[in-house]
């Protein structure tokens, strides 16, 4: 496999006529030029049993050559406090206090709080080295003085830490005290922790001005350049209530601080209260408040976890908006990324007449290429076709740069086979700091990834990408639908789930019928509202997918390119820690739609039931398929005919992830069950949501819940909803040169739904 030499991203998922979208590119070297051109994406599957990969080159103003350059990415989350006047670098005595909960105390050097220039060894820093807290000052000539704790830190234990510089005594002091309660730490009160200490060391130098910002959860690499301090030696874990004093605190002061008491308020230079700003809408901001009154406010970089339990959390309240004083922590990770913050390479203003569709900028450098996908909307407030395709951009973000098959312990067991590797997978493994993680990954300290960003290269959001289990997934899989619509001459517009979140049902009401892609798993509450209102008001929907509307997510109100998810028990790669199930971005509870009384069955008719990734089955017709009220759906399909017994995804139309009809979960009672899938292997199993007690007989050969159901129901006001309930359905549309009953059934429904008449009533 060859190395990838170039990659890029754009600033947002979608853009309308007359609007401008920006593109950012980084090559492995600052040398030569790269080529860029606009392409329309049509079919992303190179499976030889299908029509093959398709794209259309589009002449545009962006086409041309651009200087190739390497652009550095700042990886890892931290807080930055600009300090141009050196107010946080006292000339005389000073002290630093904070509460600390380290998740990787033995993982090398980690800056906890610092105003430090690592290049010149100037300033001060409170850090972890070799598992112990260290307080250091440096004079800028290479000379430093340090005091080191004589007790190592325990993992996930809250401590009160105080570092003191006392020039009068020419001394550095360090006070370390565990502040464990019944719920805030890994261990409880019964464990006799030997971790408290008070130590001192000679201070033979004076701290010189570092000429950097103050950083929480990292160290400054060098003096600030263009107003920017690069952060290195990232800290993993939580920090709560950091403070700086312009005096030398004593042991009595440190003891009071460990109890949360106020000491020497006149000498307090800064006090960053991470809970300040929590309100009824959560804490949807990167702003960090200095509660001292001195105006040293800061900003979160790369989205540390907000709404996190603090040093004094007692377990009685689980929602941070109800008890902000116990949620004063930020949880930092060395592998967070919310925006690469590269410099712009070029931009594109959408001209009038450019068709609404799936697009990408194709970039080429040396012998490698990359695609930067985006979606062109019709002119704002208009529809240019009767059909709307919703691109699953929230789910694209959830899976962005996932490494499930290659790194998850159970990845191969879930798939039923060994993973398929390609260049993008190897690149993610080698150069993770370019790309960041998905919400299916864990941070280096084991915490599940709950924030994901569009503003970074997303290597599996590429039209030719094949997922680790060997088939295509998300965007490339959704191109099966785009290709089929083009092949059959249907006129359509495209919008994204981000647009739906912004515009609601008003967006959908412009269209006679709205189509999903193959896997709209992640949705906002507002998106569910939009779908439900649209259908109830007479809209028509085609759910050509499975595992849709499963996880509730939120879009960051200040950074709409960032999405947040908080997961609970279910089909999940991780579960949020106790007390942290509520979104920082709005304070609402996260988890599954089903867990908030809104199972997918209530809107689309079917909901998640099973999954497996070895092969796909086919559908057999149920008695309702012969009901004369749905003859229009079954037209041209014989009563005994198998539906979807061939396809590009797993070899059939019923596979990978499956949804079922279930009246108990809210399937409308007038729903007709037209067909159910069969021939699923033991790799397919009932999802945890339906397992009150694990027991034998839960797999595809044994349990009735392992199936996908094709359903139809009518709604009030002439609406209708058709569901195929399988991720692999779209992969069968082009099977046998588009001459198959999956294509026929889908076309029957779509032709009916675009008519100027109500959907057939059942």
From Swiss-Prot:
Regulation of catalytic or functional activity: Activity is slightly inhibited by Mg(2+) and Mn(2+), and slightly increased by Cu(2+). Activity is slightly inhibited by the chelating agents 8-hydroxyquinoline, ethylenediaminetetraacetate, o-phenanthroline and 2,2'-bipyridyl.
Reactions the enzyme catalyzes: N,N-dimethylformamide + H2O = dimethylamine + formate
InterPro entries: ConA-like_dom_sf, DMFA2_C
pH profile of the protein: Optimum pH is 6.0-7.0.
Activity relative to temperature: Optimum temperature is 50-55 degrees Celsius. Stable up to 50 degrees Celsius, inactivated after incubation at 60 degrees Celsius for 30 minutes. Activity decreases below 50 degrees Celsius, with 20% of activity retained at 25 degrees Celsius.
GO molecular function, one term: N,N-dimethylformamidase activity
Keywords: Hydrolase
EC identifiers of the protein: 3.5.1.56
UniProt feature coiled coil, ranges: none
Record text on subunit structure and interactions: Heterotetramer of two DmfA1 (alpha) and two DmfA2 (beta) subunits.
Cited function: Hydrolyzes N,N-dimethylformamide, and to a lesser extent N,N-dimethylacetamide and N,N-diethylacetamide. Has no activity against the substituted amides N-methylformamide, N-ethylformamide, N-ethylformamide and N-methylacetamide or the unsubstituted amides formamide, nicotinamide, acetoamide, benzamide, acetamide and acrylamide.
Protein name: N,N-dimethylformamidase beta subunit
Taxonomic lineage of the native organism: Bacteria, Pseudomonadati, Pseudomonadota, Betaproteobacteria, Burkholderiales
Encoding gene (name): dmfA2
């Amino acid at each position: 496999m060859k190395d990838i030499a170039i990659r890029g991203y754009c600033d947002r998922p979608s853009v309308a006529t007359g609007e401008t979208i920006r593109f950012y590119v980084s090559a492995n070297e600052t040398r030569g030029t790269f080529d860029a051109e606009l392409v329309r994406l049509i079919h992303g599957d190179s499976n030889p049993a299908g029509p093959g990969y398709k794209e259309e080159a589009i002449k545009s103003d962006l086409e041309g050559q651009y200087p190739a350059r390497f652009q550095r990415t700042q990886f890892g989350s931290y807080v930055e406090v600009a300090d141009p006047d050196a107010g946080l670098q006292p000339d005389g005595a000073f002290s630093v206090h904070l509460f600390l909960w380290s998740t990787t105390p033995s993982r090398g050097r980690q800056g906890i709080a610092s105003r430090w220039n690592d290049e010149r060894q100037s300033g001060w820093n409170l850090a972890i080295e070799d598992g112990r807290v260290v307080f250091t000052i440096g004079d800028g000539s290479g000379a430093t003085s340090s005091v080191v704790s004589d007790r190592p830190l325990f993992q996930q234990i809250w401590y009160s830490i105080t570092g003191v510089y006392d020039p009068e005594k020419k001394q550095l002091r360090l006070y370390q005290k565990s502040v464990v309660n019944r719920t805030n730490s890994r261990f409880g009160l019964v464990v006799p922790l030997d971790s408290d200490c008070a130590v001192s060391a000679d201070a033979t130098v004076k701290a010189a001005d570092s000429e950097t910002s103050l950083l929480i959860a990292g160290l400054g690499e060098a003096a600030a350049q263009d107003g920017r301090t690069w952060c290195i030696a990232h800290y993993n874990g939580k920090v709560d209530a950091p403070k700086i004093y312009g005096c030398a605190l004593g042991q009595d002061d440190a003891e009071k601080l460990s109890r949360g008491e106020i000491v020497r308020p006149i000498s307090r230079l800064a006090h960053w209260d991470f809970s300040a700003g929590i309100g009824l809408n959560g804490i949807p901001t990167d702003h960090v408040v200095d509660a001292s009154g001195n105006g040293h406010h800061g900003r979160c970089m790369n989205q540390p976890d907000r709404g996190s339990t603090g040093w004094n959390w007692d377990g009685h309240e689980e929602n941070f908006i109800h008890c902000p004083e116990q949620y004063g922590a930020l949880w930092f990770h060395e592998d967070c990324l919310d925006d690469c913050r590269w410099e712009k390479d070029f931009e594109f203003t959408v001209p009038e007449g450019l068709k609404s569709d799936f697009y990408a900028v194709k970039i080429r450098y040396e012998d490698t290429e990359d695609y930067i996908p985006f979606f062109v909307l019709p002119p704002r407030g208009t529809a240019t076709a009767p059909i709307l395709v919703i691109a699953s951009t929230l789910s694209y973000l959830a899976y962005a740069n996932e490494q499930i098959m290659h790194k998850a312990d159970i990845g191969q067991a879930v798939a039923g086979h060994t993973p398929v590797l390609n260049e993008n997978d190897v690149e993610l493994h080698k150069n993770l700091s370019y790309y960041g993680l998905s919400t299916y990954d864990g941070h280096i300290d084991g915490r599940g990834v709950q924030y994901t960003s569009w503003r970074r290269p997303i290597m599996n959001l590429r039209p030719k990408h094949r997922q680790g289990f060997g088939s295509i997934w998300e965007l490339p899989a959704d191109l099966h639908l785009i290709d089929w619509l083009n092949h059959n001459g249907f006129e359509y517009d495209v919008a994204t789930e981000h647009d739906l979140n912004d515009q609601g049902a008003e967006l959908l009401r412009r269209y006679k019928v709205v189509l999903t892609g193959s896997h709209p798993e992640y949705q906002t509450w507002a998106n569910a509202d939009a779908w439900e209102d649209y259908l109830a008001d007479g809209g028509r929907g085609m759910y050509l997918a499975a595992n849709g509307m499963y996880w509730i997510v939120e879009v960051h109100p200040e950074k709409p390119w960032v999405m947040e998810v908080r997961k609970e028990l279910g089909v999940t790669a991780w579960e949020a820690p106790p007390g942290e199930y509520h979104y920082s971005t709005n304070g609402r509870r996260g988890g599954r739609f089903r867990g908030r009384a809104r199972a997918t069955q209530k809107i689309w008719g079917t909901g998640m039931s099973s999954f497996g990734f070895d092969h796909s089955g086919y559908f057999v017709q149920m008695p309702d398929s012969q009901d004369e009220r749905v003859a229009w759906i079954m037209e041209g399909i014989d009563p005994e005919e198998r539906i979807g017994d061939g396809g590009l995804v797993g070899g059939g139309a019923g596979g990978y992830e499956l949804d079922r009809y279930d009246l108990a979960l809210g399937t409308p009672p007038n729903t007709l069950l037209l067909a159910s899938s069969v021939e699923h292997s033991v790799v397919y199993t009932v999802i945890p949501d339906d397992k009150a007690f694990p027991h034998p007989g839960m797999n595809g050969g044994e349990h009735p819940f392992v199936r996908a159901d094709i359903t139809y129901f009518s709604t009030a006001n002439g609406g209708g909803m058709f569901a195929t309930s399988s991720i692999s359905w779209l992969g069968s549309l082009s099977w046998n040169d588009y001459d198959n009953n999956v294509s026929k059934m889908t076309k029957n429904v779509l032709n009916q739904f675009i008519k100027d008449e109500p959907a057939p009533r059942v």
